[in-house]
A protein has these predicted regions:
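Conserved donor NDP-sugar-binding/catalytic core segment of glycosyltransferases
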Residues: 100-148
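Short aromatic/hydrophobic "clamp" motif used to bind/position activated sugar donors
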Residues: 88
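Short, well-formed alpha-helical segments that are part of the catalytic scaffolds
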Residues: 12-25
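Cell-envelope/extracellular polymer assembly enzymes that use nucleotide-activated donors
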Residues: 2-4, 33, 209
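Acidic helix N-cap motif at the loop->helix transition within catalytic regions
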Residues: 17, 43-51, 100
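A conserved acidic beta->alpha catalytic loop
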Residues: 22, 38-49, 95
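Short beta-strand/loop segment that forms part of the nucleotide-sugar
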Residues: 31-41, 61-65
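Glycine-rich, basic loop-to-helix element that forms the pyrophosphate-binding segment
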Residues: 66-83, 100
């Protein structure tokens, strides 16, 4: 089974560097590739990708689109079209994975399920130190991880550690609280729902819509807690409000029990 890791990014090359550095050093990952879903970043990001392409042990592909505002759904669809994996892991370009991230996702992969991961939020100070290479994040050093937590650099710590006994199928039909920064789906299921709905522009709810349509298609949710946690570098987050065009679009998907979107991997005329 070949895996494609789709990394979303927009004009934050220093954070992307930290993410790619970890993806470059994955252990027991099997066959995989990285595809950058770039929502219109400038030349600095292009240089980061080109520099990594020279030293990366697996294919590293750059899927770039023109900057026309926040178009995460479209950039992910572009990356998916260029990918060749049987199984796709979606990761944000400000989330540092552990060295066994791909390996653990591979072990969780199961036909008929998509996997949702979790994240640990990093403090602004610690994120800045990582960005400026003042310190480094050793994701395999348990002592240092606990120390970072007690120094208030992490918002939580227990979820960082692997628990093979965690019940993973309790909320099989629950689409809420999906973290778009860390989830995985089979390629055949991605195409079954026609990918991400590019009708979502601006911040929010495109991930929820994707999860709802997967569930409507009969794909169930599997929790990646205590297995594929990522470290989320600090940035100010916009809060999604349950109002506006994107929220209304999600409600329509729920009401109509929609499966395939019209404006996705394949564009359907109205």
């Amino acid at each position: 089974m070949k895996i494609s890791v789709i990394v979303s990014t927009y004009n934050h090359p220093s954070y992307l560097t930290l993410v790619l550095d970890s993806l470059k050093n994955q252990v027991n990952a099997g066959e995989y590739e990285i595809v950058i879903a770039d929502d219109g970043s400038g030349p600095e990001t292009k240089k980061v990708v080109e520099d990594f392409q020279k030293i990366f042990p697996v294919p590293l592909i750059h899927a770039w689109q023109k900057d026309l505002g926040f178009r995460l759904a479209a950039s992910r669809n572009n990356a998916c079209k260029l990918s060749s994996g049987d199984y796709l892991i979606f990761l944000d370009g400000d989330c540092i994975p552990k060295k066994d991230f791909v390996e653990k996702h591979r072990k969780l992969a199961e036909k008929g399920f998509f996997v949702t991961g979790t994240r640990v939020l990093l403090s602004q100070t610690f994120s800045l130190d990582l960005e400026n290479q003042v310190t480094r994040l050793d994701t395999n050093n348990f002592f240092k991880l606990f120390r970072h937590f007690f120094d208030n650099h992490f918002n939580k710590i227990i979820s960082v550690f692997y628990n093979p006994f965690f019940p993973r199928k309790l909320d099989k039909n629950n689409w809420k609280k999906l973290r778009g920064c860390n989830f995985a789906v089979w390629r055949e299921d991605l195409f079954k729902v026609n990918g991400f709905d590019e009708g979502f522009t601006g911040w929010g709810f495109e991930d929820s819509d994707f999860a709802v349509r997967l569930i409507n298609a009969g794909v169930r949710r599997k929790a990646g807690n205590f297995a594929v946690t990522v470290f989320h570098l600090y940035h100010k987050e916009l809060k999604t409000k349950q109002e506006g065009p994107s929220w209304d679009r999600l409600l329509l998907t729920l009401k109509q029990k929609k499966v395939a979107c019209k404006k996705g991997l394949v564009q359907t005329k109205p």
